[in-house]
């Protein structure tokens, strides 16, 4: 069935105008953007197949080549889909610029979409103002976190350059288990001592993974 074969009152465009965007399913919203299917393939069915196969969250991370594996999704449509999610990511970043950190949840929300490859462990440092606003973040290491990879001098040199009042460490666990390892605790201890010496406080160390987080401060480990 083609879009034009659907009762006019039930077509996505008409329902959007009549009842608002909330009345449409994710597949219908995507179909509105992609607009047309290919020979023998209804664009709504194509979008339903795409979302049911990958899930909406996973869809945002698919490459152009992976998107094209779904029948009816060529290069142009794959680029449109990738562009949608890239805009969404940039909007999220823009809304979180100068975010005031009140707790670990704020750090978790800020880091969403900012870890380029979640199959690898990344360590970031967030530089904060006197009002606990995030000035900037920087990637410190990529790979398994060990004390030998961490150079406090470089981290705090960057903090001084940014005129940061305090810093927060953030790293991900690709396994999804956010409990800290002994190495995580060792790194935190080293950087806390360096921060105390330089009077640039290490406010927290937040581990993220599998839509969850662990805060050293919340667990009285700082």
From Swiss-Prot:
SUPFAM superfamilies in the record: JAB1/MPN domain, RuvA domain 2-like
Chain positions recorded as Zn(2+) binding sites: 171, 173, 184
SS bond list: none
Pfam families, sorted: RadC, UPF0758_N
Domain named MPN: residues: 100-222
InterPro entries documented for this protein: MPN (IPR037518), RadC_JAB (IPR025657), RuvA_2-like (IPR010994), UPF0758 (IPR001405), UPF0758_CS (IPR020891), UPF0758_N (IPR046778)
Entry keyword set: Hydrolase, Metal-binding, Metalloprotease, Protease, Zinc
Listed GO biological process terms: proteolysis
UniProt family annotation: Belongs to the UPF0758 family.
PANTHER family cross-referenced by the UniProt entry: DNA REPAIR PROTEIN RADC (PTHR30471), UPF0758 PROTEIN YEES-RELATED (PTHR30471:SF3)
UniProt name for this protein: UPF0758 protein CT0611
Classification lineage: Bacteria, Pseudomonadati, Chlorobiota, Chlorobiia, Chlorobiales
């Amino acid at each position: 069935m083609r879009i034009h074969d659907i009762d006019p009152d039930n077509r996505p465009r008409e329902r959007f105008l009549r009842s608002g965007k909330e009345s449409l399913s994710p597949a219908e919203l995507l179909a509105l953007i992609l607009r047309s299917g290919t020979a023998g393939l209804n664009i709504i069915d194509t979008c339903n197949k795409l979302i049911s196969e990958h899930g909406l969250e996973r869809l945002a991370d698919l490459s152009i080549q992976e998107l094209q594996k779904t029948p009816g999704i060529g290069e142009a449509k794959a680029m449109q889909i990738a562009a949608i999610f890239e805009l969404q990511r940039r909007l999220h970043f823009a809304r979180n610029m100068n975010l005031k950190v009140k707790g670990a949840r704020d750090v978790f929300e800020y880091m969403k979409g900012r870890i380029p490859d979640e199959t690898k462990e990344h360590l970031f440092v967030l530089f904060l103002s006197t009002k606990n606003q995030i000035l900037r973040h920087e990637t410190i290491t990529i790979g398994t976190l060990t004390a030998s990879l961490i150079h406090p001098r470089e981290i705090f040199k960057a903090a001084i350059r940014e005129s940061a009042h305090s810093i927060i460490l953030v790293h991900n666990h690709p396994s999804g288990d956010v409990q800290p390892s002994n190495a995580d605790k060792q790194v935190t201890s080293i950087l806390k001592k360096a921060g105390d010496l330089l009077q640039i406080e290490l406010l927290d160390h937040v581990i993220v993974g599998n839509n969850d987080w662990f805060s050293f401060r919340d667990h009285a480990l700082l």
